[in-house]
Curated annotation (Swiss-Prot):
InterPro entries: Beta-gal/glucu_dom_sf (IPR036156), Beta-mannosidase-like_N2 (IPR054593), Beta-mannosidase_GH2 (IPR050887), Beta-mannosidase_Ig (IPR041625), Galactose-bd-like_sf (IPR008979), Glyco_hydro_2_Ig-like (IPR006102), Glycoside_hydrolase_SF (IPR017853), Ig-like_fold (IPR013783). This is Beta-mannosidase A. It catalyses: Hydrolysis of terminal, non-reducing beta-D-mannose residues in beta-D-mannosides. Pathway: Glycan metabolism; N-glycan degradation. GO terms for molecular function: beta-mannosidase activity. It comes from the Eukaryota. It comes from Emericella nidulans (strain FGSC A4 / ATCC 38163 / CBS 112.46 / NRRL 194 / M139) (Aspergillus nidulans). Keywords: Carbohydrate metabolism, Glycoprotein, Glycosidase, Hydrolase, Polysaccharide degradation, Secreted, Signal. Homodimer. The active site is at E476.
Length: 940
């Protein structure tokens, strides 16, 4: 985005490593943090960052609270030193001693035993330093000291160097010059998050001592599983046997004549699929590689969520020689092929009505599928406090939301293995990216060498995960930065284009191909695709760049439009092969605001609220003029389409406004998702919808569907609904009055069923003669396809009053889910009003809510009118979601809903169920909700 429970025998970690020697975790050693800006020393941790240690020491308050980001900017401007206590029991008689850092953020100087060991400048690399000689010269206990320089000050100094290149256009959020560092780019601010620019030893570190006999320690492993003969940009031959290529990166010395044993066991049963000594072993530098072909084995395939089972295997790689085992490592993996098809449309496809151009969709195990999902951003500014528990809740919500793919946006950070592990278990495909975003970047030799080390390490580290779906070069470089650069400096554009190709195509592409044959590569997140690939050429991929061919479609789309006058005009949505970004921002809930705002700041345009809104960004801290524009966009979206909250209680009114912005956001996304999914049966053959964005980095107005603490916004519930396997959708041209009803399915077989249509007035009474509309329509929809089941014009219907009418749509079908042997009953409900919600003559629905403690079921009933956007809300103090929410309810209908508790409550005696509330669109202007709000939020 740019600025404007598994089986008990499962291996839960990605790998288990054994080798010779000693391994001392530096997390078990005491640390201190100091700085001249602090004038004192505080206890510290590893892994950690300076902000977190200052918070734990009571030096600072919650960085996210109120205006603390402004007050705490001094931390980013200071240099910080982490110092360990003496490390016990390190012995000089070992063959060698190494300091290994899984991650240092970012500009660091490492000292050991008083000796300057190295300086680092890349947050995303693993570093291993031989400190053997320093240990032998140590006069006291071995101490590690890490000096971190201020990242903002460091890059500003680099920028001030006359030799540093300057580009005609660069996109800056709060802090400038982020493109000059290999550090999480959003640490300098983005339009959904703060600019804390943290520093520290953000990942684990340890000391390794290696013995004189067979001294080796495994640093990284590349496990590549693919079909024989596979090439990254070509479709795998599913008839070919599986190839397992295992490569180990190590420190130390291998003994003579090393060999590799590869053993594969099914995770659930422990059955051995294969156990083979590699036919050949290659030793290059400090990497040993072996390969084996499974000619007689047929592993169970791994499938994404809703497409089949997530079958997993443990692969154990053992390095040995004639006399002993040297090292053993176990990786959990799965057998699948994943391929990004960017090939030209074939004659067969043309004969099927698919428009000319090129494909842009994913295929898993040889089957094309519809990708449904969202974009993942860093879940916290401070990665060391991102826990497995939090990510488990988040990825469970992804699956519950009917999503099968997440795009891991750059530039945050490369995900830790445990998040890939969770995705492997749940069948969530992870489109992954290298950490470049919305900027041009240097291409000097030092920068490229630094990037090369980063790329190789991370590609190899995560390659064994079956959830890995793609490597993309960066975010919006081709689709945004190249056009902006050409517009700003057309005379020098060829130079900048060559720089783009040098980094993303000539450098990164070959590195990806050299380290994996199972994953496709795209130089940019949004692209028109390629014309040709020649791996022996200096620029091995020839990009298509901008396509001007009428009637042809190339590449994926990225769409943002903040002109709310056209938000629901689907004729202006982009028509393409795949939608990888689209969205609009909204406010989080009142409960979330209460985490970071004082009670007197709980109103729409308070300083705290506006400061926490980063759309649009302003360079520097505390500037709100651009932020106010983003607040105004949300306001206009509500005022144009929804009842305007007007509650005399200021906090109740604030809560209603927060919800109103979420209603607009959810409806806008719903409109687009339905449009893109319908495209699967249109000439564009559109096969992907990934909205912006899944979750929040902090508490503030953003594009997220899930708030910082895990609370679902309206968006996530609505997206879950329209991401169901088969849906019925209305498409209304509000200018002409034309109304079309479509059924869309992403199943792999055709499905048949019926759609029931019923016109009601807002009191819930059926309109005479169903307003001239049939009550039941049969349908058949093809595999991953759409079909129009009905069309009319609103002006031709017998509606007494378009402001008091609603069309309910109910679909039922019996169909085969992918890889399922028996048919499943599938249903979907939708509705349509021939007037926007603000113009409707709403009737008090008379909502009643009850709870059965025995069954754990909430029952909602509308007694006197149609309830639009029926919204169940739960109190602060726990995290979870309702099995249904934001639904339509008509009189006589009882909706039974359960609440899935993901975390809490801490007080086991708290009967939180009594504090669950329900409201609807009717309540947005009403004061009747005030009492329930007070109960839910603990207000007097």
């Amino acid at each position: 985005m740019h600025f404007h429970g598994i089986a008990t025998q499962a291996v839960l970690a990605s790998n288990i490593t054994t080798g010779s020697g000693r391994h001392v975790s530096l997390s078990d050693v005491k640390w201190t943090l100091s700085s001249s800006a602090l004038n004192s020393t505080v206890p510290a941790s590893l892994p950690s960052q300076a902000h977190l240690d200052l918070l734990n020491a009571g030096v600072i308050d919650d960085p996210y609270y109120g205006l603390n980001e402004i007050d705490l900017q001094w931390i980013a401007q200071a240099n910080w030193t982490y110092t360990s206590d003496p490390i016990p029991d390190l012995l000089e008689e070992y063959e060698s001693t190494w300091l290994v850092f899984e991650g240092l953020d970012t500009f660091a100087t490492v000292t050991f035993c008083g000796h300057n060991i190295a300086s680092t400048n890349n947050q995303f690399r693993q570093y291993a330093f031989d400190v053997s000689s320093a240990l032998k010269e140590c006069t006291g206990g071995p101490v590690v000291r890490i000096d971190f320089a201020s990242a903002p000050n460091t890059v500003d100094a680099i920028a001030a160097d006359p030799k540093t290149p300057v580009w005609p256009v660069q996109l800056t959020a709060q802090l400038p010059n982020r493109w000059l560092m290999r550090k999480q780019q959003s640490d300098f601010g983005w339009d959904w998050g703060p600019a804390f620019a943290p520093c520290g030893p953000w990942k684990p570190a340890y000391v390794v001592q290696l013995e004189k006999t067979a001294p080796i320690h495994v640093l990284n492993t590349d496990l590549d599983i693919y079909r024989q003969g596979n090439i990254n940009h070509l479709p795998p031959d599913q008839k070919q046997p599986w190839v397992v290529n295992a490569s180990i990166d190590f420190i130390g010395r291998l003994p003579a004549e090393p060999r590799l044993l590869i053993e594969i066991k099914e995770l659930e049963t422990g059955d051995v699929l294969a156990s083979q000594i590699s036919d050949s072993v290659t030793l290059i530098g400090t990497s040993i590689t072996g390969v084996t072909t499974l000619k007689d084995a047929s592993p169970k395939l791994w499938w994404p969520s809703s497409l089949g089972a997530q079958n997993l295997y443990n692969v154990t790689i053992t390095v040995f020689n004639k006399t002993e085992e040297v090292a053993r490592i176990t990786k959990r993996t799965g057998f699948r092929t994943i391929f990004l098809n960017q090939r030209n449309i074939t004659a067969t496809q043309l004969s099927q009505g698919i428009a000319p151009g090129a494909n842009w969709h994913f295929e898993v195990n040889g089957k094309e599928f519809y990708a449904k999902g969202s974009n993942f951003i860093p879940p916290d500014t401070f990665w060391p406090r991102v826990t497995k528990q939090k990510m488990t809740r988040l990825l469970d919500a992804v699956v519950a939301g009917n999503q099968n793919m997440l795009r891991i946006w750059s530039s945050g950070a490369y995900l830790p293995d445990f998040i890939y592990d969770l995705a492997d278990e749940r069948g969530i495909l992870l489109w992954s990216e290298f950490q470049f975003s919305d900027s041009m970047y240097p291409v000097d030799e030092d920068f490229l060498d630094n990037v090369a080390q980063e790329v190789v390490y991370n590609v190899r580290r995560v390659n064994h995960h079956p959830s890995l779906a793609l490597w993309a070069g960066g975010n919006e470089i081709e689709s945004l930065m190249l056009p902006l650069t050409r517009e700003a400096d057309p005379d020098n554009y060829p130079k900048y284009l060559a720089e783009y190709e040098k980094l993303y195509i000539s450098l990164i592409l070959p590195l990806v191909y050299e380290n994996t044959r199972s994953i496709s590569y795209s130089p940019s997140s949004t692209t028109e695709g390629y014309l040709s690939v020649n791996l022996s050429a200096p620029v091995p991929m020839t990009e298509r760049y901008e396509n001007d061919e009428p009637g042809a479609y190339y590449g994926d789309t990225d769409y943002y439009n903040y002109d709310t006058t056209v938000s629901f005009d689907y004729s202006i949505y982009p028509v393409g092969r795949f939608a990888n970004e689209f969205g609009f921002h909204s406010m989080p809930s009142l409960q979330t605001w209460q985490q970071v705002a004082d009670p007197e700041d709980l109103y729409f345009n308070s300083t705290t609220v506006v400061i926490h809104n980063r759309h649009y960004t302003s360079e520097g801290y505390g500037r709100i003029e651009n932020s106010s524009r983003g607040m105004a966009e949300m306001t206009l979206g509500v005022e144009r389409y929804y009842p305007i909250p007007d509650n005399p209680d200021s906090v109740a009114n604030f809560s209603a406004w927060c919800l109103a912005t979420q209603l607009f956001q959810a409806d806008f996304y719903k409109s687009q998702i339905q449009f893109y999914r319908r495209g699967s049966g249109m000439p564009e053959r559109q096969l992907g919808s990934l909205y912006w964005q899944l979750e929040d980095i902090w508490q503030g107005p953003t594009w997220a569907g899930i708030e910082y603490d895990g609370r679902w916004k309206v968006l996530h519930y609505v997206a879950r609904d329209v991401y169901q396997p088969i849906i019925v959708s209305p498409f209304w041209n509000y200018t002409t009055g034309d109304l079309e009803i479509y059924v869309t399915a992403d199943l792999w077989e055709s499905a048949a069923g019926t759609v029931n249509l019923k016109w009601l007035n807002l009191s819930g009474e059926q309109i005479i003669d169903n307003a001239g509309t049939p009550t039941e329509i049969p349908f058949t929809v093809g595999a991953i396809n759409t079909t129009k089941v009905y069309s009319t014009n609103i002006h031709d219907l017998n509606l007494p009053d378009t402001r008091a009418s609603i069309l309910t749509l109910s679909l039922s079908s019996q169909a085969n889910l992918p890889n399922a042997a028996v048919k499943t009953s599938l249903t979907h409900e939708n509705h349509f009003t021939p007037s926007f919600p603000k113009d409707l003559e709403l009737v008090n629905p008379g909502l009643e809510l009850s709870y059965d403690a025995h069954s754990g079921i909430f029952t909602v009933e509308a007694k006197s009118g149609v309830s639009l956007y029926t919204w169940l809300d739960y109190p602060a103090g726990l995290v979870g979601y309702f099995t249904e929410n934001a639904f339509l309810l008509v009189p006589g209908q009882k909706k039974k809903v359960q609440f899935v508790v993901q975390d809490g409550p801490k007080d086991q005696d708290w009967e939180w169920q009594s504090e669950v509330t329900v409201r609807s669109l009717w309540d947005q202007k009403s004061s009747t909700f005030l009492y329930a709000l007070r109960v839910a939020t603990g207000r007097p």
